[in-house]
A protein has these predicted regions:
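Ribonuclease/tRNase effector modules and their secretory precursors
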Residues: 1-84
């Protein structure tokens, strides 16, 4: 199993986008990967949420990491978070 490393950019958005490192690692390890632009990959995982985010209560939080699969590690470039 490859190590997952987070870029400074990705880590800088944990609070403002509302994701955790554990959620991103879980998504990468358990969900299907899809090719995106510039040779990158992404995946999506829904998590039960049921809390307030920016003044509204959402039932689900979806975490979508964008990453590259390098020879010795997986590098997370950025993470998008969707609430619905």
């Amino acid at each position: 199993m490859k190590q997952i490393r987070f870029s400074k950019h990705a880590l800088g958005y944990t609070a403002s986008r509302g994701f955790t490192v554990a959620e991103v690692e879980d998504a990468i390890r358990t969900c299907a990967w899809a090719a995106t632009e510039l040779g990158r990959l992404d995946c999506r995982k829904d998590f039960g949420y049921g809390r307030e985010w920016n003044g509204k209560v959402y039932a689900t939080k979806q975490v979508r990491p964008v990453f590259v699969d390098e020879a010795g590690e997986i590098v997370v470039i950025t993470v998008y978070t969707y609430y619905f």
